Amino acid sequence: MSTTFCSSVSMQATSLAATTRISFQKPALVSRTNLSFNLSRSIPTRLSVSCAAKPETVEKVSKIVKKQLSLKDDQNVVAETKFADLGADSLDTVEIVMGLEEEFHIEMAEEKAQKITTVEEAAELIDELVQAKK
């Protein structure tokens, strides 16, 4: 075995593939004079990062959903609850969004509001909009 000093690290990415070359800047015991890995793989065109909403936001959204849909107090509405599973139609969903906007003093863009299907999605969007106002 021999000690090899390498000093380059590079990464090249395109919309369809990524090539990564890994080299070492510190002495490394290897049997070749250069150690590198070439990896080719597809890179997704979109990256989505989702963060859980604050528990207090989820709780408020649940209460508003119950109120807007005239649900009983003992009806279980949690983060994963889908509006459709509660019997909400598109008009009900619009009313839920209006109630949320009023309660949290925010305005939801129509295209984002139309994508909301669960309590969690509504709470995440609300947290995002409230944070953006600060």
Swiss-Prot record:
Q: Where in the cell is it found?
A: Plastid, Chloroplast
Identify the Pfam families for this entry: PP-binding (PF00550)
Span of domain Carrier: 55-130
Q: What keywords is this UniProt entry annotated with?
A: Chloroplast, Fatty acid biosynthesis, Fatty acid metabolism, Lipid biosynthesis, Lipid metabolism, Phosphopantetheine, Phosphoprotein, Plastid, Transit peptide
Q: Name one GO molecular function term.
A: acyl carrier activity
Task: Tell me, in one coarse class, where this protein mainly resides.
Answer: plastid
Provide the Gene Ontology terms for cellular component: chloroplast
Which residues in this protein are found as O-(pantetheine 4'-phosphoryl)serine?
A: 90
* Expression by tissue: Seed.
| Misc | In rape seeds ACP is coded by two multigene families. There are probably a total of 35 genes.
Role: Carrier of the growing fatty acid chain in fatty acid biosynthesis.
Which PANTHER family did the record assign? ACYL CARRIER PROTEIN, ACYL CARRIER PROTEIN 1, CHLOROPLASTIC
- List the HAMAP family: Acyl_carrier
Q: Which family does it belong to?
A: Belongs to the acyl carrier protein (ACP) family.
Q: What is this protein called?
A: Acyl carrier protein, chloroplastic
Write down the species. Brassica napus (Rape)
Lineage, please?
Eukaryota, Viridiplantae, Streptophyta, Embryophyta, Tracheophyta
